[in-house]
């Protein structure tokens, strides 16, 4: 089958083949050498930013360091400034991957990564999802995320859904009547996995609980559920495991 997902990454400037090769090199680092490898990478990252990132230079207050422990700890509050003031030299806003957190902690967080770094994240996502039998090129995703209302943003997400083999459910209205339609869609489509906001997926699980129903009884192809890095309470985790699939529950950041 044609790899539409991999193609969409490449068309958007994300070199997935090269990133996969780099990931294999990282995974090949032996357990005995891993601590030294991490310390060396930490040193390289800090030295790079002290040399090429004016915002980080100002935050640290000097252009060199001797020990990791002497570096000040950054929080989201230190990032509350325009993105262009935080980017390193050679990385204009037009040539980086930009995203943001939900701000559920009280401090919104808009961040950027260079495209190779972000592709490396995708390469690792592909590897980890594979543990549960999920292939981004072929597996059907039930997606519980919002979508932009503006025309261009909306169409862009719809195209990504098409290429990524994703069916997107609305999260702006999750009344019982709407969730009943969601359930019908699960009965009629062979979804392989769920990916969405914690709050939205938990609400769907509570709806199923009221109906005394486990989702895999109507959608037996379902393999796993992935929720975003919002706070997931133990009770909610058990609820998801009980009402959705009784198999696996992965917990990861949105990418």
Where are the model-predicted features located?
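AMP-binding/adenylate-forming
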Residues: 119, 140-202
């Amino acid at each position: 089958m044609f790899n539409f997902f991999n193609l969409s990454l490449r068309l958007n400037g994300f070199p997935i083949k090269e990133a996969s090769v780099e990931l294999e090199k990282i995974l090949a680092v032996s357990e005995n050498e891993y601590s030294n490898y991490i310390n060396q990478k930490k040193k390289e990252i800090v030295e790079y930013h002290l040399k090429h990132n004016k915002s980080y230079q100002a935050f640290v207050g000097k252009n060199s360091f001797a020990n990791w422990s002497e570096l000040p700890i950054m929080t989201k509050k230190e990032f509350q400034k325009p993105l262009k003031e935080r980017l390193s030299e050679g990385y204009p806003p037009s040539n980086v991957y930009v995203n943001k957190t939900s701000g559920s902690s009280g401090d919104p967080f808009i961040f950027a990564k260079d495209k190779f770094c972000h592709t490396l994240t995708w390469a690792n996502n592909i590897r980890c999802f594979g543990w549960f039998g999920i292939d981004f090129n072929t597996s059907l995703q039930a997606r519980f995320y919002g979508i932009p209302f503006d025309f261009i943003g909306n169409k862009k997400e719809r195209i990504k859904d098409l290429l990524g083999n994703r069916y997107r459910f609305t999260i702006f209205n999750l009344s019982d009547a709407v969730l009943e339609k969601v359930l019908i869609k699960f009965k009629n489509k062979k979804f392989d996995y769920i990916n969405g906001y914690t709050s939205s997926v938990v609400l769907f699980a509570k709806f199923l609980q009221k109906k005394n129903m486990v989702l895999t009884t109507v959608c037996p192809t379902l393999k796993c559920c992935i929720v975003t890095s919002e706070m997931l309470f133990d009770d909610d985790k058990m609820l998801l495991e009980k009402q959705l699939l009784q198999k696996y529950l992965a917990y990861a950041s949105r990418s």
